[in-house]
Regions:
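Nucleotide/phosphate-binding catalytic cleft detector across ATP-hydrolyzing
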Residues: 1-34, 50-165
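Short beta-strand scaffold segments in enzyme catalytic cores
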Residues: 36, 43-48
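Short, basic and Ser/Thr-rich N-terminal targeting/leader segments
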Residues: 39-41, 118
């Protein structure tokens, strides 16, 4: 446990340090139930109860990884640089829209597990957060540097050894 967060993973040591730090940062910013989303190379969506228990979460390929996977593993699809559209009318727009909708859908499905709890909120960070945050229909707080906020909180909460000398 650290800074009010307890690790509920089946094997606590398997939780990545970046996810742990993001959970600690989220707890520092919000005391209620939260879905902690970090959108980068991978997208993580982690559930944090109001009492600080990390219940588990999901890891999925990030937006760019999805785009590259489609381009690299299909015969006819390009590396898409299209735009989101409610009704895409080009292949590149359809690819981008599909990848962004997949991200938003995964986040919303995870959030549904806590949506009925008072004060439930999604805290979202990461370089790709801005690409699909506007597609989400849930209480959302964008946070720059959530992992760094968590690391700073961890450092303050960790007893320091006495100075030598």
């Amino acid at each position: 446990a650290c800074a009010g967060v307890r690790n509920g993973y089946a094997v606590p040591g398997q939780l990545g340090a970046d996810r742990w730090a993001a959970l600690i940062g989220a707890r520092r910013l919000h005391s209620g139930p939260a879905l902690v989303v970090c959108a980068g190379t991978a997208t993580t969506a982690d559930l944090l109860d109001a009492d600080g228990l990390f219940r588990g979460g999901a890891i999925l390929p990030g937006v760019d990884l999805m785009l590259r996977a489609l381009a690299g593993n299909t015969a006819q699809l390009p590396l898409a640089d299209g735009h989101f559209s409610d009704a895409p009318r080009s292949t590149v727009d359809a690819i981008v829209t599909g990848c962004l909708q997949a991200q938003a859908g995964a986040v919303e499905r995870m959030f549904a597990q806590i949506a009925d709890r008072p004060g439930a909120r999604c805290l979202m960070s990461g370089g790709a957060a801005g690409r699909f945050a506007d597609l989400l229909h849930l209480p959302l707080q964008r946070v720059d540097n959530l992992v760094l906020i968590g690391l700073a909180t961890f450092a303050r909460a960790t007893p320091q050894p006495p100075a030598m000398g």
